[in-house]
Swiss-Prot record:
Residues in FAD-binding FR-type domain copies: 150-255
Cofactor entry: heme b; FAD
Protein known as: Flavohemoprotein
Natural source organism: Salmonella typhimurium (strain LT2 / SGSC1412 / ATCC 700720)
Organism taxonomic ancestry: Bacteria, Pseudomonadati, Pseudomonadota, Gammaproteobacteria, Enterobacterales
Region named Reductase: 147-396
Length: 396
């Protein structure tokens, strides 16, 4: 526990942190990668270049300082970050490196004096121990499962299937021929790659896209403009190639009773965790209402449409609605969509009126903000809305 003086000293630095903003974390990362370049093998350098990770770390530091005397308020954020850390195989000793550079950054940018640095050192130590303890639990849980493992495990690609102009699915099976650990629908897989020509090892998290079967895993990857890993997977990865995988993880998952109605709301590649949820609901013959609401640019980039239809037909109470923002003439001729333009949930108010319904959202942050605002305006409780951000977390 932190003493009152330490808490007061840390909280007194909040105005300085807010005034400095993400420049603080930019300095921190630049310093850390200069002194410990081996960490470039772990961090997503694309998120470093676009600033997303720097903004996310700043928000986390500011949130910790603001809630330092109320750590339970931070536990949801701790769980989200700890789950992601296990996908990167973060180790306790790496927290010492981060702590060293965080304190050095505070000293170099603000010269706040030893009392402030000591207070932040104590505060960081408490938070680091919370993460280390929770991550140790997750590592143990993953290794103890049937088909589970520690660290990373070699797999090979056994299927590569284009699903749209931008999305391709990949299926993996373990090289050792053993079983693989189950996961909760909505969780992701840690994919570790360092192909020829990559400056650093790259680690990405991709949502699992079907119900666990104990034999292997399936993900689906959108080819991003300028995306190093997604373009390599689309253009160079082949059936038979090897990859290393970290065990499934993530704090976003579906956990509902058979009589709980569910709405799965997505845009673009945000449908990937929803596919695992829908597959699970279908395989378990979910008896309550299931809604599948999806938005895409047009039919060229709309993936898994046939699979969703097939799964939906097996459910006793299923409603699907698809929006195309800019449908092609072919889309119109084939009637591949239900509505044109942006997703408008007010048209389907009757399908989402049950107060017990749980809503799962995934897609671009702007889309999720747009959809969540509509749901709240239609009377949905915020507690019933669950969402996943691809990349560093953002608050809707």
């Amino acid at each position: 526990m932190l003493d009152a003086q330490t808490i007061a000293t840390v909280k007194a630095t909040i105005p300085l942190l807010v005034e400095t903003g993400p420049k603080l974390t930019a300095h921190f990362y630049d310093r850390m990668f200069t002194h410990n370049p081996e960490l470039k093998e772990i961090f997503n350098m694309s998120n470093q270049r676009n600033g997303d990770q720097r903004e996310a770390l700043f928000n986390a530091i500011a949130a910790y300082a603001s809630n330092i005397e109320n750590l339970p308020a931070l536990l949801p954020a701790v769980e989200k970050i700890a789950q992601k850390h296990t996908s990167f195989q973060i180790k306790p000793e790496q927290y010492n490196i981060v702590g060293t550079h965080l304190l050095a950054t505070l000293d170099e940018m603000f010269n706040p004096g030893q009392e402030v640095l000591d207070a932040w050192g104590k505060a960081y130590g408490v938070l680091a121990n919370v993460f280390i303890h929770r991550e140790a639990e997750i590592y143990h849980e993953n290794a103890s499962k049937d088909g589970g493992w520690e660290g990373t495990r070699p797999f090979r690609i056994v299927a590569k299937t284009p699903r749209s102009a931008l999305i391709t699915s990949f299926e993996f099976e373990p090289v050792d021929g053993g079983t693989v650990a189950e996961y909760r629908p909505g969780q992701y897989l840690g994919v570790w790659l360092k192909p020829e020509g990559f400056a650093h090892q790259e680690i990405r998290q991709y949502s699992l896209t079907r119900k666990p079967d104990g034999k292997g895993y399936r993900i689906a990857v959108k080819r991003e403009d300028g995306g190093q890993v997604s373009n390599w997977l689309h253009h160079h990865a082949s059936v038979g190639d090897g990859v290393h995988l970290a065990a499934p993880a993530g704090d976003f998952f579906m956990n509902v009773a058979a009589d709980t109605p569910v709405s799965l709301i997505s845009a673009g590649v945000g449908q990937t965790p929803m596919l695992a949820m829908l597959d699970t609901l279908a395989k378990e013959q979910h008896t309550a209402q299931v809604n599948w609401f999806h938005a895409a640019e047009n039919g060229d980039v709309h993936a898994f449409a046939d699979e969703v239809s097939e799964l939906g037909r097996t459910l006793p109470r299923f409603t699907a609605h698809t929006w195309y923002r800019e449908p092609t003439e072919s889309d119109r001729a084939q009637r591949l969509f239900d509505s044109e333009g942006l997703m408008d949930l007010s048209k389907l108010e009757a399908a989402i009126s049950d107060p017990a319904m749980q809503f799962y959202l995934c897609g671009p942050v702007g889309f999720m903000q747009f959809a969540a605002k509509q749901l709240v305006s239609l009377g949905v409780n915020n507690e019933n809305i669950h969402y996943e951000c691809f990349g560093p977390h953002k608050v809707l």
